[in-house]
């Protein structure tokens, strides 16, 4: 089983961004946490990050994964192109946000991408990724039986 984690713009700057909102952990810490989880669970995982919409769409279009966790970053709020690419992806998928987007500025409260995902986890910090990975792993393994 292969799971894909996609991180959008500015997530590579974790640890340097507003620590009151995003915490003290770095992007490398996040990747390490995800890779450790994958190793403990016997799952192959790829962590992909891009600040460019087209690169994210191209990665999704490869369709070479069994489950998806995506943090579209700011693209969450307006990228109908990523939304359409997600709609093509027919595997379990969860949108994740480190901060609680529903408790922040008005423009951050709308997600155009969540409606084409199985669900959304928001505001649980880096732990939200683990919850999302657990879900996509479980649902992917059940659907492959």
UniProtKB/Swiss-Prot annotation:
One example of a Gene Ontology biological process annotation: chorismate biosynthetic process
Site (Transition state stabilizer) location in chain: 17
Lyase keyword on record: yes
Catalytic activity: 3-dehydroquinate = 3-dehydroshikimate + H2O
PANTHER family to which the protein is assigned, alphabetical: CATABOLIC 3-DEHYDROQUINASE
Family: Belongs to the type-II 3-dehydroquinase family.
Pathway of action: Metabolic intermediate biosynthesis; chorismate biosynthesis; chorismate from D-erythrose 4-phosphate and phosphoenolpyruvate: step 3/7
Organism domain of life: Bacteria
Pfam family, one: DHquinase_II
EC number: 4.2.1.10
Keyword Cell inner membrane (UniProt): no
Database matches in InterPro entries: DHquinase_II, DHquinase_II_CS, DHquinase_II_sf
Stored Gene3D superfamilies: Dehydroquinase, class II (3.40.50.9100)
SUPFAM superfamilies in alphabetical order: Type II 3-dehydroquinate dehydratase
Name of the protein described by the UniProt record: 3-dehydroquinate dehydratase
Function comment: Catalyzes a trans-dehydration via an enolate intermediate.
GO molecular function, one term: 3-dehydroquinate dehydratase activity
Organism: Thermotoga neapolitana (strain ATCC 49049 / DSM 4359 / NBRC 107923 / NS-E)
Residues annotated as transmembrane: none
Residue positions of the active site: 22, 97
NCBIfam families: aroQ, PRK05395.1-2, PRK05395.1-4
Alphabetical UniProt keywords: Amino-acid biosynthesis, Aromatic amino acid biosynthesis, Lyase
Subunit (UniProt): Homododecamer.
Binding site for substrate: 71, 77, 84, 98-99, 108
């Amino acid at each position: 089983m292969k799971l894909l984690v996609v991180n959008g713009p500015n997530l590579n700057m974790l640890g340097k961004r507003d620590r009151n909102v995003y915490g003290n952990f770095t992007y490398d810490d996040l990747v390490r946490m995800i890779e450790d989880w994958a190793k403990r669970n016997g799952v192959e995982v790829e962590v992909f990050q891009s600040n460019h919409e087209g690169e994210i769409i191209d990665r999704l279009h490869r369709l070479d994964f069994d489950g998806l966790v995506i943090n579209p970053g700011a693209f969450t709020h307006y990228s109908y192109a990523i939304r359409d690419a997600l709609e093509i992806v027919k595997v379990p998928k969860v949108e994740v946000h480190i901060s609680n987007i529903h408790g922040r500025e008005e423009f951050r409260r709308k997600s155009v991408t969540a409606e084409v995902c199985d669900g959304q986890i928001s505001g649980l910090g880096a732990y939200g990724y683990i919850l999302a990975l657990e879900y996509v792993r479980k649902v992917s393994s059940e659907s492959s039986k």
